[in-house]
Amino acid sequence: MSCPYPFKVFSCTVSRHSHQAACVVAKTQATSQPRGALSPGGGFLAALALSVTGWRIGSKGHIVAQKTSTPPPDTIQAGDMITDFDQYLLGEGTHRQLWRVLGAHVQDDATHFAVWAPNARAVSVTGDFNGWSGTEMTAVGQTGVWQVRIPGVGDGALYKYQITDANGALREKADPVGFGAQHPPEQASVVRDIRGYGWRDGAWMETRAEAADRAAPISIYEVHLGSWRRKWDDGGRPLSYKEAAQDLVGYVRHMGFTHIELMPISEFPFDGSWGYQPVGLYAPTIRFGPPHEFRDLVDAAHAAGLGVLLDWVPGHFPTDEHGLATFDGTHLYEHADPKEGFHQDWNTLIFNYGRTEVRNYLVANALYWMEEYHLDGLRVDAVASMLYRDYSRDEGQWVPNKDGGRENLEAISFLQEMNVAVYGADASVMTVAEESTSFPGVSQPVHTGGLGFGYKWNMGWMNDTLSYMALDPIHRQHHHSQMTNPIMWQYSENFILPISHDEVVHGKGSMLEKMPGNDWEKLANLRAYYGYMWMHPGKKLIFMGCEFAQPGEWSHDGDLNWDAASRPAHAGVQALVRDLNHLYRDTPALHVKDCMPDGFAWICNDPAQSTLGFARFGAAGDAPVVVMCNFTPVERVAFRMGVPTPGEWDEVLNTDAAAYGGGNRGNLGGVLSEPTPCDGHAQSVTLTLPPLSTVVLRLKD
């Protein structure tokens, strides 16, 4: 007989009918328990408790618990957290809330420890609570997980796992799912009670979907917390999370940005990696404070109307002995073959995305940051290195996929799974891919074959336009297409225009140093470029310091040159970026159709004069915007350009304004169109284009 009443196991609907099942398990809010035995016909009888050692999927896809003739050893102590259903999910590698089971969990009078080490001969917990002598852990069924509950251990305790591998060798490891860690170079994990934080961001959480929408203005301030500002009167230390909650949040709000993007804060041993070589994916770095203070930072940002994105690194991990490498004596998280598992550029190890438990470890980590820390999105690092098996490898140094190709099919599948899980859990967040190739469909839905990201960095736009701006203006006429061609692929993805930390390090120079000419021309070039960038379709991202034209490259060992920011020329660029943000946010035509081709139209392009003009459009009834850029140091007087609509056009921004450090040449606040055909339009306006400038006009209401 069939049963018409299915029940839910997470997002999968499972029928109560299976002829092969000895027991079917349902997930409840409190625990997971057998619902009842099945009659020979498949119907439910009274509830019957069974000893469960394993799980399988029945022939029709039903979740089945298998009964054994003898009960398993009593390996689970009273008060342990791992339920039968947890065991099933752990065994299958599909536990989306992995952090609620593994790691160190503070209870009333004890701490429960659990770690996945399936190939270990034995595992112990060693810490400052047992004289670092080791407390034996017990295996949990067939899951590969070991656990123990230790009375008297609480928040702040130091611990490591002592893992005896199959050959009898002893390894000391930090907790892969630890919520805290010692300050590097110390390597122990730290018990952190992350329960019960008093969030005050309910209003933000209810409406944040609007801030992530493709039609919303998104302007992101990328930050390296350790070097944004330092306390030089206190030994040169970086700001704490709590101090950043006041100083950083206040500054970003004042500057008109919509989001803060934090470079990686998952615990990492080497400062020089900037966080891109993490060992503690579940632990906010202690460099700036404990976990609850990181929550204070996020809570403060939300109170200020700012979203918080985290730079997330699922592509690789370092070889540090206390980390994930050969965790239980085997290549547990990484590939055994270095042609698949070793990243030659960074001397790091690559996750084995073909292993279900490893995928689950990473997917659960993405969900963890959203759920436990209320983050509003993830920027996924180095996606290109994940997508291709031959990435940065010579011939013969990589292993083809099962079809003989170069694509990393397992990584592609993992990224799709991650995006489906993240958006499935909370559609109000965003995921962003740093992807530098032409891999198709990065920000397209998974069900259409895409990777499922919300947005993708437009690395091509960044490379082309910065290359153009570095040229002496006399040569720009021969490279005009570098400023115009990017629009040809602008709508193939949901793009963010990025000026990131990678562009101001390793000898590339600061944004100001990239610009040609004398000091005045450098600043004018940069102002014109920022005007072009903010008016161009696509969401915006800029790295800290670039907003005030920091004179030199960024260094993680110091902080930003705030002295320069106080000088008039640099303060002018800072004021420009603030005004660009507010204009972008307040003008629907500049953001509503960032990702739609009918929101943009070319008006004029003159390579010989290095000028270009375009229009931006919003929804019906939104005032259109016209943008004109002059990338030569020559003033253009009585410059005529077509406009899409007759009427009075306000000059809402001019990068040559005196307030920004310019020469204050312009159009006296606005122009009136004339019935003189130009550039294919029946109406046109006559403009003064200052040298090295961007002028923005908006149709007067």
From Swiss-Prot:
SUPFAM superfamilies: (Trans)glycosidases, E set domains, Glycosyl hydrolase domain. HAMAP family: GlgB. NCBIfam families: branching_enzym, PRK05402.1, PRK12313.1. GO terms for biological process: glycogen biosynthetic process. Keywords: Carbohydrate metabolism, Glycogen biosynthesis, Glycogen metabolism, Glycosyltransferase, Transferase. One of its GO terms (cellular component) is cytosol. The active site is at 381 (nucleophile), 434 (proton donor). It catalyses: Transfers a segment of a (1->4)-alpha-D-glucan chain to a primary hydroxy group in a similar glucan chain. It comes from the Bacteria. The keyword ATP-binding does not apply. One of its GO terms (molecular function) is cation binding. Monomer. Belongs to the glycosyl hydrolase 13 family. GlgB subfamily. This is 1,4-alpha-glucan branching enzyme GlgB. It is an enzyme of class 2 (transferase). Pathway: Glycan biosynthesis; glycogen biosynthesis. Its EC number is 2.4.1.18. Catalyzes the formation of the alpha-1,6-glucosidic linkages in glycogen by scission of a 1,4-alpha-linked oligosaccharide from growing alpha-1,4-glucan chains and the subsequent attachment of the oligosaccharide to the alpha-1,6 position.
